[in-house]
């Protein structure tokens, strides 16, 4: 009888429970070693992404600041005269960004009016009334 059991056992193929447990333990050990490495790569990728986003924001803010505080240049189309000040045709005029309007008369080349408005101030000059200003800042 024992001989028969031994023969039956030799004919059966497969893994024993102990062999399966050993394989599972080896896989778990490998996974435990790999997980920290993978997490480091994920952290590095997130840091690189954050740095890239910050650089993009910096460039955008710099462009907006340059836009907001830059000066606009205009070439005088004709000779402009007003209150003893003459600007000859072709002269480059520099105006603060945000200037709303500057008008002149085509017939005689005189400057008729100028107005400027920013967040807290409104300034206007006209030939008839001269300078006027309003401070719109809340105090």
For the regions a protein language model found, what residue spans apply to each?
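N-terminal leader/signal peptides at the extreme start of proteins
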Residues: 1-15
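N-terminal single-pass transmembrane signal-anchor helix
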Residues: 12-38
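Aliphatic-rich helix starts adjacent to a transmembrane/signal segment
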Residues: 40-58
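N-terminal amphipathic/basic membrane-interacting segments and domains
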Residues: 74, 78-82, 89, 95-99
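Mixed-charge, low-complexity intrinsically disordered regions
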Residues: 81-82, 86-88, 113-118
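Short, surface-exposed interaction loops/tails
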Residues: 99-139
């Amino acid at each position: 009888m024992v001989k028969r059991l031994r023969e039956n056992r030799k004919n059966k193929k497969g893994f024993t429970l102990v062999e399966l447990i050993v394989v599972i333990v080896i896989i778990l050990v490998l996974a435990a070693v790999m997980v920290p490495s993978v997490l480091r790569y994920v952290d590095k990728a997130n840091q690189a992404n954050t740095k890239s986003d910050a650089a993009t924001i910096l460039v955008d803010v710099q462009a907006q600041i340059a836009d907001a505080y830059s000066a606009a240049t205009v070439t005088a189309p004709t000779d402009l005269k007003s209150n003893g000040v003459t600007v000859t045709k072709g002269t480059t005029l520099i105006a603060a960004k945000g200037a709303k309007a500057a008008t002149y008369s085509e017939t005689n080349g005189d400057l008729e009016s100028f107005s400027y408005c920013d967040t807290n101030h409104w300034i206007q000059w006209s030939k008839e009334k001269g300078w006027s200003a309003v401070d719109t800042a809340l105090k």
